[in-house]
């Protein structure tokens, strides 16, 4: 993710093609990077079955912690896919307080627990320290459902299970 990664890799790929070189590893890198965004939505759909009408909270909107940069942020692509599927989306990010008009349907919470209030599932998208350090018991108390999709593999499966949450990571 991030604003430059895809553009930089695509530039390298194009340069290679100009010289008659097929950079299959670069093409695969682009495909995998873009596919991770769809993976989060697929995991939600696998667990929840139907996304229409489901309430989903996205934790972390920027492409990485420590920035306010939303250019090519995975969270925005995930939000777009969820909205298209008919989900109701809320979000929280420590520095993002407002999204562009395109994402007017996304409710921005004042904190992670506010964004997660009465949701069916939470998706950790960006590993901000305050989001990776979230209290699983407090999170579960405000949620309607118990599903947490951890796209950063930052959470402890044991701690989340002890709090009554079903944690789904990436790569497992």
Residue ranges of model-derived segments:
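Structural/interface elements that position substrates and couple domains in central-metabolism enzymes
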Residues: 1-172
């Amino acid at each position: 993710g991030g604003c430059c990664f895809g553009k930089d890799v695509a530039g390298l790929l194009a340069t290679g093609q100009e010289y008659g070189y097929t950079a299959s590893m670069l093409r695969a890198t682009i495909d995998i990077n873009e596919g991770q965004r769809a993976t989060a939505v697929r995991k939600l759909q696998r667990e929840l079955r139907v996304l229409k009408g489901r309430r989903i909270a996205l934790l972390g909107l920027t492409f990485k912690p420590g920035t306010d940069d939303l250019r090519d942020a995975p969270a925005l692509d995930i939000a777009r896919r969820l909205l298209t599927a008919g989900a109701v989306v809320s979000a929280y990010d420590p520095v993002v307080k407002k999204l562009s008009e395109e994402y007017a349907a996304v409710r921005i919470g004042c904190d992670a627990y506010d964004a997660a209030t009465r949701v069916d599932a939470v998706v950790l998208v960006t590993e901000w320290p305050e989001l990776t350090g979230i209290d699983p018991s407090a999170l579960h108390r405000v949620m309607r459902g118990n599903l947490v999709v951890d796209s950063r593999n930052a959470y402890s499966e044991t701690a989340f299970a002890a709090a009554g949450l079903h944690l789904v990571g990436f790569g497992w």
